């Protein structure tokens, strides 16, 4: 046994030395292909994106009172500062994904080598090797930086050159950011399943709470999902989610973040998730009768240079001038006059507040419902307004008649 242990230690030392040399030589190792070349370029020279770049969030479109009427996004994420993330979540992450996080400098060569030797001797994957820094780099290049599927595959491909570049970027990251900032950025970035990205969206999705209020069991379940959000989905595999949660709780206890008695107590508790995940509808199509105003606002902003892709990648609040009370009166008026189900007819009405400097749109309605299902009397056309203005129609006849008199 002692000889085997000595052999293992020797192998660890040899592998660690080889990895250090490879890491030093990484800049000259080529991956081939345009997408892989771009990933390499990002890893070498675009550290500012990894350390200061924004991540996609949720843009909210509101009425004049600030009440949300639609949400626009590519990834449902709410970026929150460190102080709004439960310490339990950070402790769960470190104890499970990277126990030497506060000791290493972005790349845990000792842990990497030991995991490699363990896996070789075991004939399979027994230990992971990526640090939190490395996982952050990989996820950022995959979720944020990749512009197409090919680049996403290049950012996550299983190859030694890509891994070495990832390690180098992880090391640079550690020199640039404080440890807590790395944890915060990581927890704001990654996917937790159910179309939730970042710890805040995950907390809302599964527990209808905030990231700041996560208890040890909730934090442990969410961190446990990172191993495989599909296989450990608590709605389709609750037993697996419980087992993984309890592993994380025991890791937290073993690392001294919570007492073992506390871990045991939480391990005996049910998952406590919502009956169904709390999601968020996306797009003007979900705004109901406010959809026409939502659509108009997006088209107006596009004319001003703020395109839909930018809005979907931002975390903006777009406050419209729509007044819900006036909107309801206008809606009742057109639908009392023309039924939404009248074939071939759609009556529209805009109410615009006059003014010298601005003319605020207070209501924008159609007798038909906003939507894409014609069988349900829905339409997105004709729009109540146009960016080139509405025709005055018969309104001007009175002026012609007055002139004739």
Residue spans for each PLM region:
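Surface-exposed intrinsically disordered loops and tails
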Residues: 149, 273-289, 356-358, 374-376, ...
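N-terminal type II signal-anchor transmembrane helix
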Residues: 1-60
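Short pre-catalytic segments that frame enzyme active sites
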Residues: 67-78, 201, 205, 230-234, ...
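Peptidoglycan glycan-strand catalytic modules in the bacterial/periplasmic cell-wall system
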Residues: 55-58, 62-257, 369
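Extracytoplasmic low-complexity, Pro/Thr/Ser/Ala/Gly-rich segments
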Residues: 38-78, 276-281, 287-288, 294-303
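Short amphipathic alpha-helical coiled-coil/interface segments
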Residues: 244-249, 267-271, 334, 357
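Short, positively charged
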Residues: 29-43, 157, 304-306, 322-335
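Non-catalytic structural connector segments
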Residues: 259-319, 327-328, 332, 338-345
């Amino acid at each position: 046994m002692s000889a085997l242990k000595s052999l293992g230690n020797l192998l660890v030392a040899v592998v660690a030395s080889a990895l250090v040399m490879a890491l030093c030589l990484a800049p000259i190792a080529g991956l081939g292909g345009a997408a892989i070349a771009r990933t390499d370029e990002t890893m070498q020279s675009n550290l500012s994106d990894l350390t200061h770049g924004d991540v996609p969030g949720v843009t909210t479109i509101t009425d004049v009172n600030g009440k949300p009427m639609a949400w626009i996004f590519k990834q449902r994420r709410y970026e929150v500062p460190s102080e709004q993330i439960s310490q339990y979540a950070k402790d769960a992450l470190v104890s499970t994904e990277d126990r030497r996080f506060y000791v290493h400098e972005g790349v845990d060569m000792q842990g990497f080598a030991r995991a490699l030797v363990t896996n070789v001797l075991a004939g399979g994957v027994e230990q992971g090797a990526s640090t939190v820094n490395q996982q952050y780099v990989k996820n950022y290049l995959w979720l944020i930086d990749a512009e197409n599927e090919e680049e996403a595959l290049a950012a996550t491909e299983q190859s030694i050159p890509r891994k070495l570049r990832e390690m180098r970027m992880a090391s640079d990251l550690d020199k640039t950011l404080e440890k807590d900032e790395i944890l915060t950025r990581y927890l704001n970035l990654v996917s937790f399943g159910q179309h939730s990205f970042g710890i805040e969206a995950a907390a809302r999705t599964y527990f209808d709470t905030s990231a700041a209020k996560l208890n040890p069991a909730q934090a442990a379940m969410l961190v446990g999902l990172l191993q495989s959000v599909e296989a450990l989905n608590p709605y389709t595999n609750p037993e697996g989610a419980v087992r993984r949660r309890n592993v994380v709780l025991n890791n937290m206890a073993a690392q001294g973040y919570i007492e073992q008695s506390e871990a045991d107590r939480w391990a005996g508790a049910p998952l406590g998730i919502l009956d169904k995940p709390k999601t968020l509808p996306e797009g003007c199509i979900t705004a109901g009768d406010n959809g026409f105003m939502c659509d108009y606002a997006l088209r107006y902003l596009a004319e001003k240079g703020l395109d839909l892709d930018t809005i979907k990648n931002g975390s903006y609040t777009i406050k419209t001038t729509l007044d819900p009370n006036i909107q309801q009166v206008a809606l009742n008026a057109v639908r009392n006059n023309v039924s939404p189900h009248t074939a071939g007819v759609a009556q529209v009405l805009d109410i615009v507040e006059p003014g010298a400097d601005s003319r605020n749109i207070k209501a924008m309605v159609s007798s038909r419902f906003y939507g894409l299902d014609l069988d349900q009397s829905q339409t997105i056309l004709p729009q109540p307004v146009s960016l080139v203005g509405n025709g005055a129609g018969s309104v001007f006849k009175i002026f012609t008649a007055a002139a004739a008199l």
